[in-house]
Structures are given as C-alpha cells and as structure tokens.
Amino acid sequence: MVDKFLIETDQNEFQPNLWKNGDSDRLPNRCPETQLNVLVVGAGPSGLMTALECWRKGHNVVKILERSNSPVFTGDVIVIGPSALRAFRHWPDMCAELEKSKMDSIMYYRKHNGELILGPTSLGHNDPEYTAAWKGIPFAAPHQIRKDFYRMLLRQVARVGIRVEYGQRVEKYFDDEAAMLGGVITDQGTIMFADLVVAADANRTRSDLLIAGAHTPSRSSGMSVYRTAFPTERALQDEAFRTRWGDAIEKGISHHEFWMGPGMHLGLFISPEFVAFGLTPRDSFLHEGGNEPIESWEPDVDPEEVTKVLNRVPDWNPVIKSLVKNTQRGSIVHWPLLWRNLRREWTSKSGRVVQAGDAAHSSIPASISGGTLALEDAVTLASCLHLSCSSAGSKGAPLGARIYNLLRYQRVSCVQKMSFVNAEGLSGSSMEDAIKENPESVRVRFPRWLYRHDPEAYVYEKYGQAFAHLVEGTDFENTNLPPGHTFEPWTIEQIHKDMMAGKRVADFLDGDWS
C-alpha cells in the first residue's frame, strides 16, 4: 500500500450539528454584531481563520465555499510563527489543542556531506531571551503537524456554527455596486451575494479577473521541490536511517535538519510518527528527462529520479542517499516553486471583494512564513472590518477592506524578499565563508520584526492614520516592516537579474532585517 501525501476525508465530519457550539465558557467574548454579512471562498487555513476572526469581531459569516469535495489533508508540517499565534489566545479550545499537540524539535544545519555547521539550535523566536515575551500565547513550536492544525481549525469553525459547503467551485466573482454587494457564481450556476466576499481560494483565484483583469503571470523562482512524507516505521526499515536516528526516535525526540549543498538543499523532519523531506534544487540541477514540476499533488515521481538529482552534486552523505533511494515509489511530489509578482491592489473596484492568503500573495517554502502571513491576513481583515462597520454597518466594508490592503501589502512584500535570502543561504552560494566567519549566519531567518508583530493591535494603532490617508490623502507610514527600511516595490525579474550579476540578495536589504 502506497503512503498517500494527500488524504481526503468525509465532508460531513465537521458539520456544525455534530459539534458542541454556543458554550460561552469555551468561546471568545464576541464583539457586538456589526450587521456585516461575509461570504468566504476557500476552506484552507486563511479562509477558516478569516471566518473565525470575523465571527469573533461580530460579523455574520454566511458560509464558507470550498471547491474540494471534502477536507483534504497533507501529511507534512507547517510553520506558524508567534505573530499569527497571538490571535489564538482568544480561543480557549484551540489554545488547549495547541498546548496538547505542541512538538518541539532540535534543529541542525549540515553540509550535504554530513559535516555539522550549526546545532543543536532552534528558530530565532524561541531563543531564551525572547520566550518571556510569549506569555499568554500558545508555544510557537518549530512546526505544527499540518493535518492536526487544519483539523483544529475545522473543529472550531463547526463549534461557532459556521458551515463549510464542499464541492463548490467559484467560477466568477462580481461586484453589484448598485446593491452594495459582492457576489460569486459557482460552476453549478449558483449565484450568492454578501456585503463582503473574501477570496481565500489560493493562487489563480478567479477573483484576479475581477480585481486585476487577468491572472498574475507565473514566473519561475528558479527552484522546485521534491516532497514526501511517510510513517517513521517505514523509514526505520532502512538500516542507515535506523543507525543514525533510531535512538532519538525511541526517546521521542524530533529533529528538523537542513542539509545544504551547492545549488540545492534538503529539509528533513523526523518525528516518532512520521518522516518528511523536501529536496529543493535550483532548476539547473534537475535531472534531464525527469518529471517536469507541475502544480499538482499527484505523487508520481520515482525515487530514482530524486537520487539522480542528488548525484548532480558529489559527496552527499550516504544516509540521505539511502533515505531517498528507499522512499516508496508513488509517494513523491515534484512541485514547481512558481512566483507571482505581488500586486498592490487586493480589492475589487467597489471594495466588496477582497483577497487573503495565497490568493493575494504567493510564497515559497524558504520564507517559512506562508502560513503565518495567511493567518495575519485573517486577523487584520476582521479587525479592520470591525472598526469600519461598528458604526457604519455594512456600508463600511469597502473602506475596511482597503485599509487592510494598505496595512498588509508592504509587510508581505518584505517577507517575500526574505525568502530569497533564505533560499540563497540554504543552497550553499556563500556557505564556506559563512561557516568560517559565523556559523549562525546559515540559520534560516525568522527576524524580530516578523515574529514580534501583533496584527490585531497594529490595526487599532494604525487605523485612524490609514483612514486619513485613504480619505484625505495624508501621509502614511507602515511600521510593521524592518526598522529603517525604505520600501520599494520589486519583481522576481529584478531579483534574477541581480543574482545573474553576481550580487547576493542579502547585500541589498536596507534597514535592520535581523
């Protein structure tokens, strides 16, 4: 039996009637109703968290539409940073679940031949000097089990009585300015309206056509990823794996390791329950004649192909080669890391349709912030709508959506640029110098300005200034960016041009990105 990377489950498992809801002891204090009806499209983490935070802020979430026929779980990990986890302090059940399922892991950085560069260590936000600041919020583990985290969100959505309707693929978004409504048309011809429609249905969302007139063109980031996950008991059948990690697994210790070679890196997660790895080669290191990377979760890659990619760089440690070689056939996905240049506008002309999460901005794994940004979006949008609609009702929704866009655009752009710095370091472009001068420099960047951010507090701090900027044209400056940074828009084409000229991305980051 093949271990599936993608698992579909019963669409009725998380229907509200099956879950206890309305228990005031376990639900957040809800803000007074704003009379704003919100329709959410997309039942991924961004859409689910948007629905929850909108409910908490007093908005009426009509329903969530999801194109899949049931909840879909992938079998690996997700990183959620403290800035996103702050919102969970309002949700007792989810806080308890995060505490129960928290899983710390030891992090190591190694050369591809196994030589230790740095470790044991952790993500920067869990360094001892910072952990005191996280009192009252869930522990920001180096990772969350993606399936468990997703199921937690689905359960909470059910508890507050919000229904997810599956098998609802949205083919068109539209504005009805006369009626002051946004709307969607599904592939079944069903038309639905709401005061505000949140497009959280990932990249190539049809909301692009309404907001920008076309989908944002995909550009290669210059990288792709071979990705898989499988039970640890299967990995332990490999003698080399068992010899290296068997004792730690038996003691319940989890490892998160980065193996760094010229032109490629391998991220490896090992826990007592499952093993996951992602090999990220630059396109020039792909095996000629191998499977082209496509945006599909169909696991159709032979481990032999991945081994050939590894062999493009000599001296990989035998334990990594053995792990890849013995991965089960039909369990590896080859996913292209495509880039979509960030658009400034995330709202429709009327402001009644707004994008969130991957629908608004793409990310690559090296940012380790895609999930964090998606949840920050949700918290920010719901809070902006709270302020814009508390007195104006649904009429205030467009302004709230535009202020959300203003508060998020520059921050997201900075996080996106940081992902190229991480990818550059992990792929060994300056590894030798880094090892000699400062091993800490190879550490994946998870900077202070990113993880110290409180998206909800930021809305209440900046809303008045943002309002004046949009309505009266006064100056406005975001402060959720690297200190001292002067923001300028950028494109993937510019990044590639600079890299081709021999420049390092890290060298042209002004301000404090630490």
Swiss-Prot record:
The keyword Flavoprotein applies. GO terms for molecular function: FAD binding; monooxygenase activity. Its cofactor is FAD. InterPro entries: FAD-bd, FAD-dep_Monooxygenase_BioMet, FAD/NAD-bd_sf. The keyword Oxidoreductase applies. It comes from Claviceps purpurea (strain 20.1). Pathway: Pigment biosynthesis. Its EC number is 1.-.-.-. This is FAD-dependent monooxygenase CPUR_05423.
